[in-house]
Amino acid sequence: MLVITRKKGESLLIGDDIEVTVVKLDDGSVKLAIDAPKKLTILRKELYNEVQEENKKATNFNPSILKNIKSK
């Protein structure tokens, strides 16, 4: 893991097309601005983990419950 110290207004580059800038520093939190291609999905880790968990739940579908549905 790379650890970098940045001040407000300073940036770091990831590859050729991603720039992360420190926008604001508060008590115990940092606001970051991320400039990246629109095709790239950027999620907070806790949201990513939540999406992964929902995807796992969706794959546990039991097709036998469809037998109770009447067709028109």
Curated annotation (Swiss-Prot):
It is found in: Cytoplasm. Coiled coil: none annotated. A translational regulator that binds mRNA to regulate translation initiation and/or mRNA stability. Usually binds in the 5'-UTR at or near the Shine-Dalgarno sequence preventing ribosome-binding, thus repressing translation. Its main target seems to be the major flagellin gene, while its function is anatagonized by FliW. GO terms for biological process: bacterial-type flagellum organization; mRNA catabolic process; negative regulation of translational initiation; regulation of bacterial-type flagellum assembly; regulation of carbohydrate metabolic process. This is Translational regulator CsrA. It holds the Pfam family CsrA. It comes from the Bacteria. Keywords: Bacterial flagellum biogenesis, Cytoplasm, Repressor, RNA-binding, Translation regulation. Homodimer; the beta-strands of each monomer intercalate to form a hydrophobic core, while the alpha-helices form wings that extend away from the core. One of its GO terms (molecular function) is mRNA 5'-UTR binding. Belongs to the CsrA/RsmA family. GO terms for cellular component: cytosol.
